[in-house]
Amino acid sequence: MAIRKLAPVTPGSRFMSYPVFDEITKSKPEKSLLEPLTKSGGRNSAGRKTSRHRGGGHKRHYRIIDFKRNKDGIVATVAAIEYDPNRSARIALLHYIDGEKRYILAPKGLKVGDKVESGEKVEIKTGNTMPMKNIPLGTDIHNIEMKAGKGGQIVRSAGAFAVLAAREGDYVTLKLPSGEIRKVRVECRATIGVIGNADHENIDLGKAGRSRWLGIRPQTRGMAMNPVDHPMGGGEGKSKSGGGRKHPKSPWGQLAKGLKTRNRKKASQKLIVRGRNAK
């Protein structure tokens, strides 16, 4: 994927860049694989904000993605590569030989007409899914299950991949994009290859309005607020103390920099060999 830079004909277009949609082969999605997507505006069922800076944005349909890849032993043909407004990766429309259609995350290099398959012992090639006990060490993988049969939960965004580093007993060791090294059960499935659209991280929105199209609202700095609104509010000029308080804090008074928030008694803690922030 390439990126198109706009000419500076307006202030908004001066820094703006767009992806070149040359890999997209179909503009209209498969109707049978769409669901309504209701916006919450960052509010919960009580109507209170639980996620700030959310709201508005263009209307979308949700594309039903097959994260489980559990249709074993049936070959599918890639019918189209499509845009999905709900994620950074592209999606591929599969036509199975029994007539069923499904969407999957489109890995880098997957083209229309390619054949993909899932199962216990399928060919090691891009787009195929199998348990990690059958994947060779050193392979790049994505859409990885944390619990067998639950469907892929990690390594699903554009350009992401994990490396299958080791296999010992009932567990495989993965090196994740964050730098974390983690153990997962060997029965868990993963898909071969790197997720496509890797240039997504280099896109410059260019103007505030484009953030609003995505449903992202403006953020106000805590230091620019009054003391009643934020622990770091108030003070004369650029008061770094933040209303007499020493350290940067969240709007709810929690230390904002360096405070560890993960529960060390969590059952999965023993599966993390090396944390993502370990030096």
Swiss-Prot record:
GO terms for cellular component: large ribosomal subunit. Belongs to the universal ribosomal protein uL2 family. Part of the 50S ribosomal subunit. Forms a bridge to the 30S subunit in the 70S ribosome. This is Large ribosomal subunit protein uL2. HAMAP family: Ribosomal_uL2_B. The gene is rplB. Keywords: Ribonucleoprotein, Ribosomal protein, RNA-binding, rRNA-binding. SUPFAM superfamilies: Nucleic acid-binding proteins (SSF50249), Translation proteins SH3-like domain (SSF50104). One of its GO terms (molecular function) is transferase activity. It comes from the Bacteria. One of the primary rRNA binding proteins. Required for association of the 30S and 50S subunits to form the 70S ribosome, for tRNA binding and peptide bond formation. It has been suggested to have peptidyltransferase activity; this is somewhat controversial. Makes several contacts with the 16S rRNA in the 70S ribosome. Residues 232-242 have a biased composition (Gly residues). Residues 49-61, 259-268 have a biased composition (Basic residues). PANTHER family: LARGE RIBOSOMAL SUBUNIT PROTEIN UL2M, RIBOSOMAL PROTEIN L2. One of its GO terms (biological process) is cytoplasmic translation. Residues 31-61, 222-279 are annotated as: Disordered.
